[in-house]
Amino acid sequence: MAVLTITPLTIDNVELFARTAANILPEAWSVETYKKQVQNPDDISFLALCDGEAAGFISVWCVCGEAEINNIGVLEKFRRIGIAGKLFERAFAAAKAEKWYLEVRESNNAAISFYEKLGFDRVGMRKNFYCDPTENAVLMALDLENYCLMEKKQ
């Protein structure tokens, strides 16, 4: 059985974090941007390691009791084994935010379904939000005050 480790973003792992993000997302941020996040008290980011190999990440900004998921991703070979869920659990616990928000490409049905299983609801749309290719963003929100983390939508 694989050993999963979820570790906070630090200056020591920032380059691995940035490489992992770049391998998952076409529009990933630069190493310098992630270095700034390490210094930002509103940032909560985690790197997932599976048997010591970088497998995924989550980046969240928290302000005034609200959390915005900037990016989340899991490398293809590590998908569907629960890593994204573990990243969310760790972020939920660390952020202590009641309201959570994210945007997702309208065509990313797998991600939308996953977020809905976590309890997120569709709350809006941003027209032509993404580029390369141009695509709408589905806005999703979760109110943890009214949602028990131990209960999963079936």
Regions found by a protein language model. Give the residues of each.
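Extreme N-terminal starter segment of soluble prokaryotic enzymes
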Residues: 2-6
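Acetyl-CoA-dependent GNAT
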Residues: 8-77, 88-90, 94, 143-153
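Residue-level detector of high-confidence beta-strand sites
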Residues: 57, 123-125
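Active-site acidic-Proline motif in GNAT/NAT acetyltransferases
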Residues: 75-81, 106-107
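Conserved GNAT acetyl-CoA-binding A-motif
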Residues: 88, 94-106
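Structural motif
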Residues: 95, 117-118
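C-terminal "cap" of GNAT-fold acetyltransferases
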Residues: 101, 105-109, 118, 128-154
